[in-house]
Amino acid sequence: MNDLSRPPEAVSASRLAAFVERCADTIIRRRKLLMLLCVAVTLALGLSATRLKLDPGFNKMIPMQHPYMQVFERYAGAFPGANTILVSLRWKGDGDIYNQTFMDALRHATDDVFFIPGVNRSRVFSLFTPNVHYTEVTEAGFRGDVVVPGQFSSSNPDDLAKVRRNVARSGQIGRLVGNDLKSALIRAELRETDPATGKRLDYSAVARQLEEIRARYAKQGIDVNIIGFAKLVGDVESGIAGVMAFFALAFLVTAALLFAYTRSLKTTALALVVALLPVVWLLGALPLLGLGIDPMSILVPFLIFSIGVSHAVQMTNAWKQALVRGASPVDAARDAFRKLFVPGTVALLTNALGFMVIMRIRIDIVRELGITACLGVLLMIVTNKVFLPILLSYTRLERGTLARAQRTAAAGGSGRWSRFAVFARPAPALGVFAVALALLAYGTLESRKLEIGDIGTGAPELRANSRYNIDNAAITHQYNIGVDVLSVIVETTGFDDACLHYPVMSAIERFEMNMRGVAGVQSVTSVSSQGKVFIAAFNEGNPRWAALPRSSDGLTQGSNAFDPDNGMNTANCKAIQVLIYTKNHEGTTIAHIVDEIRRFAAENPTPNVAFRLAGGNVGVMAATNEAVGDAEIAMLLSIFGAIALLCAVTFRSWRAVLCIVVPLTLVSILCNAVMALLGIGLKVATLPVITLGVGVGVDYGIYLYERLQHDLRHGATLPDAFADAMRQRGTAALFTAVTMFIGVGTWAFSALKFQVDMGVLLAFMFLVNLFGAVFLLPALAAWLGVERAERRVQQAHAQPSPVAPATLKPSPALEPGNPVR
């Protein structure tokens, strides 16, 4: 009988085993050369890692392919403002801001902000900038000037009184001056590149200079509040020191638990070193690829370390079991490689595919995260599957540790793993299914409450009591505007000057009035409302005339409001922006406002007038939220499809695919439910966590099923095979899950809220994925007929074949295994 008459599962298993055997022999035979090569690569990439820099960027956070962002880019030159910083000075003394101390501080603070590198100096607004002016009606006609005259002296009471009158006439109360006249605002817009250097703007440097401004004027009896993307990046970066501290704590916790688990200093050190190697290689490779690391993806190296620990523990555990059976360190290393190369590599490739799937979201920061994580996992195949067996081949286990393990093995090992065999029997499996179905029903219902976008006010990346969020609350309370603004672009065609055509202005007026009544909107500004102020002024300031005339001549009276220099429209009003200031930037608020804009545009069509979304930072958030929402289902389908494909290719069994994928699917649904319960929104920072959790969680199922399949094909029953799989692979999997659960659990005390959220979600997925593999996988195997299917493959494999690899050694039905104790 030849290979053509044997089932493909048997043929592929033989060929794969022969390939693995050849690889094991090659690695052991050339271990000195390979070890020197790995050491050289480590030194070179370690040196390269010293050149790694933090690389934040505003445009990296934006889905530039989204229709909203195409509109945003089209009018970025005419209507900038998505990347804005607000600096508010609040007088803490008696009276209001019209005193010498405060006005001097405001003047100097305006200059300080003006000269920050990267600030668009034509877009700085303050009482002391020449682009802020007032207009009044006199007996001689209109008169206007800058709010603060050029010869202003803060020590002159008459000048202070004049500025007070000018501010009242300028309409800046609630905008650049607080509603209670106790604070004043400096608003500036940033460029993405520094004009002086031509390089990407250094947001860290901008944040440091803003903090210097705060410190300088806080000494003068003034409260300084600062918000904006640059300041947020600075606060996140300042929290990175805490992130590194938590990484160090997690490392120490992992080391302590690993030593308690292995009772071996040597294997503990080897596992930690090999788990750190892909992190070092990754950090060294990024500068060579022209990449940095964004503050929002600073957690990726720890994920790589966690995955590395998981696979290193499996390898050292298999090596130790071989030593217990009497093998030499070299033979034990070869045996460990032979057993774990296939499941370990498949698990890592699955992780890498999961990270690649993240790149479906067309946002640069997410794609960089996917590239970084994928590269780190691929490097781990070399460090864990090649370098670690080489190191183990040179290592001798401590005599006391080896003797203890041999005594345990001689006593029959620990009986606790045999208890798990009950879940591989049909009757108890029904109980597992009942619990799983109940969790599925609850998770499905609860996950429907999951919101897309931010939840809560302020910056969700930081805690509610952080300085940034306190500043945000103060500015939102004191002014009618904030940093959260949505810009709607009104495009006009076929008009010489659209602002002088009543149908156009009427459509904008009706749109503005409609949006003022929308929940979540704080205030609305447009050329329509500003034009009505000037028209009333033309008529002796009579408020009854604050309306839109139906003739072009009448609208001409408001032409001062239609000046492109005001930043509200382009020449001839070909494009007009309507600014909608929102009360917050929660995902539900943004979605509701966007829906209302679309509804108005659909129900109120105006010839040659189109309402286009969107600009402003809220427009960016709207595009990002929609991109995340659109990508969620596609991402999950892609990653589960990739996992299913790899499992099908590896195990040649649809039953194996279901046994591994079904628990992962349940955990993903439960993860969404946990996010909804904890008030964590689905956004750029959290969506990758779900994918990462699935990628890491699949390791447990692959390792357990591979051993289960091996024992079944050598004559074991399903319960016995699963008990042995738990003995040989489950110990390490359980340790890894608990260790990573504790490690990321410490993130709950971080100052960075996004690290807290990621820690909670990862801890949940690490632990619950293990439960899925331990309880649901054997239950599915019991009812899917895995034992019968593998028995058929075994029988076909046992039939004689003229082509049999001479190097393959028959394995016993159940190789002795012992927990590492």
Residue spans for each PLM region:
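Extracytoplasmic
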Residues: 77, 104, 153-265, 276, ...
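Juxtamembrane segments of multi-pass membrane proteins
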Residues: 419-552
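Hydrophobic, glycine/alanine-rich multi-pass transmembrane helices and their short helix-loop junctions
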Residues: 257, 286-289, 345-388, 392, ...
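Short helical (or helix-break) motifs at transmembrane helix termini and adjacent helical loops
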Residues: 303-324, 344, 351, 386-387, ...
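Signature of alpha-helical transmembrane segments and their immediate interfacial
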Residues: 4-56, 390, 394, 398, ...
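Interfacial segments of transmembrane alpha-helices in multi-pass membrane proteins
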Residues: 241-293, 360-364, 635-680, 749
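Helix-loop junctions and hydrophobic alpha-helical segments within the transmembrane domains
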Residues: 322-349, 712-735
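Membrane-proximal extracytoplasmic
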Residues: 2-255
